[in-house]
Amino acid sequence: MELTIEKAIQQAVAEHKKGNLQKAESAYRQVLKVMPAHAAANHNLGILLVDLYQSNNGLKFLHAALQGNQKVEQFWLSYINALINLDKLDIANEFIGAARKAGFSGPKFASLSERMLSPVELRAKGKFFQANDVNYLHFLRALHRNVYEGYFEIGTRTGASLVLSQSPSIAIDPFFQLSENPIGNKDFCLMFQETSDSFFENRLPKLSGLKCQLAFIDGMHLFEYALKDFINLAKISSEEALFLFHDPIPWTFKMATRNNEMLERNEAWTGDIWKLVHILIDAGMKDNVNLLSSAPSGLLAVLNPDKKIIAKLEKNYDKICAQWLDVELNEDNLLKFYETGVFVKPEVYLQSLEQISFGNRKANISKDWISQ
């Protein structure tokens, strides 16, 4: 029987590594039906749920793994990591102390302790805040459990993010390099191979009834383009809408440059998307803005922006661009960025969306969504 269990674990791990998460979850749960205290199955299922932004569900399995075998360092690390994801910092600190008493310490535990520091506290130690929570694509996958009135994506490239959507979708990219079929379970998906400026100027007037309830903006890595895309999308947004910008959290000064030719080949580049945080806060959106620490370079989330503020941003667009164009990310500006106080754990943010039932209503798709 033990061999059968171990074979089942191996198969589950293989599916997990391939990214077949539903099959892996089912296999782990089958093992736990037979052996509820199986430490590896509990641990791996917990990790899988954490990767799916379900740390609350994963905690009990990670805790069961730790209770089953406290001699495995990774069981301590995984449980503490899940607690930090949920901002349960006091409990996480208690378990770091317990791990030390059990004989575990070293750089991995030091790294977990650093994850509990605020950006300002980290900078006081001479370190950058790094977005090292679960990957942003997993965050998007969690959002796309719901169906939205309309999903817009600017900067689709390979389609890795677009494929996650189950909603009627619009994708815009000047040069698609799709690696898989993006249609999936969507009722439809319109793809426009052009710049976003061209789309909003030439295509949008020919389309009727478009509503943007969820948007992912991952285009030029330059603030003025992202700001213009945001303004254009917000003008056709639903009453409740969420906008996500990729790459707002650089972890070096160099990667925040506007000129990516200054970087080495394959060196990470966020551009100056970070400026949008200040621009939107200055415009009066602090209550709508959050920075999510989804790896590798974060997400800027803007929830339910005020249409009056959007109109002011559009009116003052040239002035705002002139004001911010030559601003660089130096030590003073980095600290001001960290002091905005809008950083939040992505899983905590997801929970806040669930509390207000954002996106929990099925999309009402009209056949007139596209003009004839």
Predicted regions and their residues:
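Alpha-helical segment of the N-proximal tetratricopeptide repeat
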Residues: 3-34
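A short alpha-helical cap/connector motif
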Residues: 15-17, 50, 66-67, 81-85, ...
